[in-house]
Design a protein with these regions (language model features):
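NAD(P)-dependent short-chain dehydrogenase/reductase
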Residues: 89-136, 141-145, 149-150
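A short helix->loop->beta-strand "cap" motif at the edges of active sites that frequently abuts
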Residues: 45-49
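Catalytic helix-loop patch of NAD(P)-dependent Rossmann-fold dehydrogenases
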Residues: 30, 35-38, 58-101, 105-106
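Conserved catalytic-core motifs of eukaryotic protein kinase domains, centered on the activation segment
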Residues: 19-26, 61-68, 111-112
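Mid/C-terminal beta-alpha module of Rossmann-like enzyme folds, strongest
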Residues: 147, 154-203, 243-244
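Amphipathic terminal alpha-helices
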Residues: 228-244
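SDR active-site strand-loop-helix element
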Residues: 9-13, 50-56, 101-103
Length: 244
């Protein structure tokens, strides 16, 4: 970075295995905080801007019951959320020009993610239990990427530093999400049943309500955010096309 006239860095790299992070805290801190600090300091020397992807996990398990705003204090309950918060704090402490995009329930056509897993399970399992007491909003990675690149291409990041929330519009539980995945895919032979989170013990307490307030990003950049079911239909259509 320092040897080249780089004006902008988009950092999508992160340690994202929430449960494994509990046993690998040092490496999670290295990727989610120390590496972010290094990027921030490097691009600052070029008088450039750092765009960084963060997460709803910085808020922890507080029972907000209203969409989380950018200025709400984070109280992470696990290593993953804490190290991501440390990354945000490292950016702020560096003084670098930056935009931080917090997102949630991210999925796409690629890699391992909830949508692809549920597509497989609902097409092969006769019954499936999915938690209904965790609420949020799915985010199609393509929508997030399009938003970020629109901001970059129009150079609107120059005068609009800060933290922004982005997810698709709407609210659902993981159970609702799974039901919609199966419906769109035509996987109607699987009996999808709602259950409590305590039926799936985990090392980390997941946020019970992680809906993100997107007022700031919509008003600042004038963007329109797609509804989560519309984006899910697009993603599943693309997944099926890739498999054909």
């Amino acid at each position: 970075v320092k040897d080249n006239d780089i004006e902008l860095i988009i950092n999508c790299a992160a340690y994202t295995n929430v449960d494994k992070a509990e046993d690998d805290a040092e490496f999670a801190e290295t990727l989610n905080s120390d590496a972010v600090r290094n990027l921030a300091e490097a691009i600052k020397d070029n008088d450039g801007t750092l765009i960084h992807i963060s997460t709803d996990y910085v808020f922890g398990k507080e029972p907000y019951n209203v969409p989380c705003r950018e200025d709400q204090k984070g109280t992470p309950t696990g290593v993953y959320g804490m190290t991501k918060l440390h990354g945000e704090q490292a950016i702020a402490a560096s003084g670098v020009k930056s935009l931080i995009f917090r997102t949630a329930w991210l999925y796409s056509e690629y890699g391992k993610n909830f949508v692809k897993t549920m597509l497989s399970l609902t097409s092969t399992k006769p019954t499936l239990k999915v938690v209904f007491d965790q609420t949020g909003t799915p985010t199609y990675a393509q929508d997030l990427a399009d938003t970020i690149f629109d901001i970059i291409e129009n150079r609107r990041y120059k005068d609009n530093e800060g933290i922004y929330h982005y997810s698709n519009e709407g609210v659902c539980s993981w159970y609702d999400f799974t039901k919609m995945i199966a419906e769109i895919a035509g996987n109607d032979t699987c009996d999808i049943q709602p259950c409590h989170s305590d039926e799936f013990p985990s090392k980390v307490t997941r946020p019970s309500y992680s809906v993100l307030d997107k007022t700031k990003i919509k008003e600042t950049f004038g963007i329109k955010v797609p509804y989560w079911t519309d984006s899910l239909k697009t993603c599943i259509k693309n997944i099926k096309a890739n498999e054909a």
